């Protein structure tokens, strides 16, 4: 019987799974829409929803709890400044999962997980300026 089994293991050890959700949640907060496999999207949804709920509550302790789960300072700032205000009226249900067909290489079922009422301009944002050594730039 499957009583008390709360999460999928996704064929990963616990540390790998934790890192996967940290990276995917940071990407979802940054781009507000990502494409992944359906089981990963279904497992990511409660992880991100809890982060947004922490951000809505605000406060230093909730910010530290979110930082422990997210590990990305810039996305934490976006989470607490932008997303908390955007979803202040909404009681849960901050994400949407849309099935997106099958991957050609291995026929894995794909899904798009996105934030509800998302910012269309956030999709495809780059990671910021690339670090360039000024000495090499001055010689050119």
Curated annotation (Swiss-Prot):
Sorted UniProt keywords: Ribonucleoprotein, Ribosomal protein
Encoding gene per record: rplQ
PANTHER family documented for this protein: LARGE RIBOSOMAL SUBUNIT PROTEIN BL17M (PTHR14413:SF16), RIBOSOMAL PROTEIN L17 (PTHR14413)
Annotated protein name in UniProt: Large ribosomal subunit protein bL17
Keyword Ribonucleoprotein attached: yes
SUPFAM superfamilies in the record: Prokaryotic ribosomal protein L17 (SSF64263)
Family indicated by similarity: Belongs to the bacterial ribosomal protein bL17 family.
One MF annotation (Gene Ontology) recorded for this entry: structural constituent of ribosome
Key word Lyase present: no
Subunit structure: Part of the 50S ribosomal subunit. Contacts protein L32.
Cellular component aspect of the GO annotation: cytosolic large ribosomal subunit
GO biological process: translation
Residue numbers spanned by region Disordered: 120-140
